[in-house]
Amino acid sequence: MMLELLPITSPYAVGVRVSGKVNQDDMETVAKAMEAKLKKEDQLGMYIELDHFEGFTLRGFLREARFVFRFMNHITRTAMVGDSRWFNRAAAVIARFFPNVEIEHFTPLQRDEALIWVAEKDAEVY
């Protein structure tokens, strides 16, 4: 698995660590985590740690498209933690599919700040 769910205690955010190429099973794992938190909250933040993002497999990309349509109105913020070169690549993908989502980059040293920012309940919804 190239995507690992992270234990985010906030009810307002889902966290993942991405390393390598994301596949269909990875996207299904994230979708299930999102659905579980959306039972109690209507809007969520996404916390993403990028280790070595290489994109998606074809099936992963198709699953990503379904993920986008299912959750596009529920994600308000995305905090991306990692090297800036991975941020630019991943942010372009997210911005293309989630145009109304606030996206911020944080360095690994700013991990705690990223967790606080992404889990703020009063994130502005467009």
Which residue stretches match the model-derived regions?
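Amphipathic, Lys/Arg-enriched alpha-helical "gate/interface" segment within cytosolic domains
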Residues: 2-126
